Amino acid sequence: RVPVGLVTFAPGTINAYHIHHKGGQILLVTGGRGWYQEEGKPARRLRAGDVVVTHKGIKHWHGATKDSWFEHLAITSGNSEFLEPVTDEVYEGLENQ
């Protein structure tokens, strides 16, 4: 069994860095505008129709832009370990990209 969840973020809301240790995650963006970023890599701006594949063991975060809600289907294999929050400096800097 692989769980599928519909996740909605209010404008300006993001999750913390996290890792999926035993499997990966697929995000199917269904609405709004958001961000996805793997640690040490540039952030990716997301909109409806985008697909993100995160492989197991990759530290990452995702969530809404400051001015839009964001919604995706999350297909996640294995448990998630949530880590430190994304800093305001990192998140605020994305709006200038």
List where the protein language model places each region.
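Glycine- and acidic-residue-biased ligand/ion/polar-headgroup-sensing regions
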Residues: 22-34, 39-40
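Short acidic-glycine-tyrosine-enriched beta hairpin
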Residues: 40-57
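A short glycine-rich, His/Asp/Glu-containing loop-to-beta-strand
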Residues: 1-17, 23
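A generic "binding-loop/recognition-motif" signal
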Residues: 13, 22-23, 42, 58, ...
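Short beta-strand His + acidic residue motifs that chelate non-heme Fe in jelly-roll/DSBH
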Residues: 16-17, 36-37, 44, 59-65
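Conserved GNAT-family N-acetyltransferase fold
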Residues: 7, 27, 52
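Short, charged/polar surface micro-motifs in flexible loops or helix N-caps
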Residues: 9-13, 33-34, 80
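Double-stranded beta-helix
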Residues: 3, 61-97
